A protein has these predicted regions:
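Eukaryote-biased detector of low-complexity, proline/serine/threonine-rich segments
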Residues: 119-186
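Low-complexity "stalk/linker" and mucin-like segments enriched in Ser/Thr/Pro/Ala/Gly
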Residues: 109-121
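Low-complexity, acidic Ser/Thr/Pro/Gly-rich terminal tails and inter-domain linkers that flank the onset
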Residues: 38-82, 108, 190-226
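Structured, charged N-terminal subsegments at the starts of enzyme catalytic cores
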Residues: 14-17, 86, 107-111
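The feature marks non-catalytic terminal segments
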Residues: 1-62
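Hydrophobic residues positioned within well-ordered beta-strands of beta-sheet architectures
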Residues: 69, 86, 101, 124-126, ...
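Short acidic, flexible loop segments centered on an aromatic residue
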Residues: 93-110
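Short edge beta-strand/loop segments characteristic of extracellular beta-sandwich folds
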Residues: 85-93
């Protein structure tokens, strides 16, 4: 109940007005009022409830603006210390004022200041150098050696997750109706299946493996094992 919070009465009034004036045929018309609501919530004292409602309000703004964004790669996996090819994509399908200001990802940072036109694709391709010590992708219960009869899971917040957190997160800074929003998207492996179309799956980070030989030449007869 917003009335329990200091200044919550005005916010409740704004929410009621947005709901009553919402037009499902033109959801973009609600974006200016939602941005005003977002600013009002942001001015409240910092607490978990405020932060939760900011996230939810931003999600509503993105949905009503029909703003689609993704970060993808054509590589199924990448090795520590290797190069990762990236593709960024944005499209705004409703008529609201929006501008792409920045895209950030690890050591990559690029300024754009590109107005997002109605239903016009904005694409950008680049490559980044993966850090040699980048955390590899593996089940969270195998990060540490197994103890007798039990797995050593030191980060209890990981328990129950179907997938690990994405190793790379792209952060788009988009200005909507004069307010800056940070929109985060995981970098996913994107490919096309002839029958199913575009598909996504988590990007995997593999460890760097090096090998060396003790002799210059090896000869194996009929696939026999070498000594």
């Amino acid at each position: 109940d917003w009335k329990r919070m200091n200044g919550g009465d005005k916010i409740q009034t704004q929410i009621s007005a947005i709901i009553s004036q919402y037009n499902f045929e033109q959801p973009g018309a609600s974006v200016p009022a939602l941005v005003t609501l977002y600013r009002a919530i942001k001015n409240l004292p910092v607490n978990s409830w405020r932060d939760k409602k900011l996230v939810e309000t931003q999600e509503l703004i993105e949905a009503c603006a029909a703003l689609f964004s993704e970060a993808s790669t054509g590589q199924e996996n990448v090795i520590q210390g290797d190069v990762l090819n990236l593709s960024f994509f944005l499209n705004k399908r409703n008529d609201v004022k929006a501008t792409l200001k920045h895209i950030r990802l690890d050591n990559f940072d690029s300024a754009f200041n590109v107005p997002l036109l109605l239903n016009t694709n904005v694409t950008f391709n680049t490559t980044i150098q993966v850090a040699p010590d980048k955390k590899i992708s593996q089940p969270y219960w195998l990060i540490y050696p197994k103890e007798e009869g039990i797995f050593d899971v030191r980060d209890q917040t990981m328990i129950g997750k179907a997938w690990n957190d994405a190793p790379f997160i792209a952060a788009y800074t988009v200005t909507i109706e004069g307010e800056d929003f940070c929109i985060k998207r995981p970098v996913q492996y994107k490919y096309v299946d002839p029958a199913k179309g575009e598909l996504y799956q988590p990007l995997v980070v593999l460890p760097q493996v090096e090998s060396s030989f003790t002799r210059e030449n090896y000869v194996s007869l009929n696939g026999a094992l070498l000594p």
